């Protein structure tokens, strides 16, 4: 999905990426409903269930009582650390911030803006897939209408969290 969005935005020169991503949301949601017949899919492997329900015992830390961390929390923390390092300590990460700040200036400085945008949208699709696997493992089902009508909640959370509509700044958290 992310690759599709990235290519669509760069090749079709969409005036605003929000239009493309919202449009593909409905396309892929409809496709999911067609494939599943509108019914939840269940019977996932133990590995997928482990992503949603698994726990890591912290007794090896010398705690008197057995305490646990959810596998999903550990996975998300690892992904956050990797992406923080990627954004703050790699050339591509710096380019992402530059493109968010001013794509024309980034293009003028020699950055292949379209290539980086496709990479960014592909990474977003990958991260959405990780989130979907965790949710499927947690509920032991792939519900085709999961997240229905939560688009506004997601946008509001980003705004309240301090995301800039104008780009050029931001953090993994």
Where do the language-model regions lie?
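Membrane-interface helix caps of multi-pass small-molecule transporters
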Residues: 3-12, 34, 85, 89, ...
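Hydrophobic positions within alpha-helical transmembrane segments of bacterial inner-membrane proteins
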Residues: 3, 7, 81, 125-133, ...
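Transmembrane alpha-helical segments in multi-pass inner-membrane proteins
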Residues: 122, 128, 138-173
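Start (N-cap) of specific transmembrane helices in multi-pass transporter permeases
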Residues: 113-125
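Transmembrane helix-bundle core of multi-pass membrane transporters
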Residues: 17-95, 116-119, 139-144
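Membrane-helix interface "capping/anchor" motifs
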Residues: 10-14, 91, 165-173
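Alpha-helical transmembrane segments within multi-pass membrane transporters and channels
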Residues: 1-25
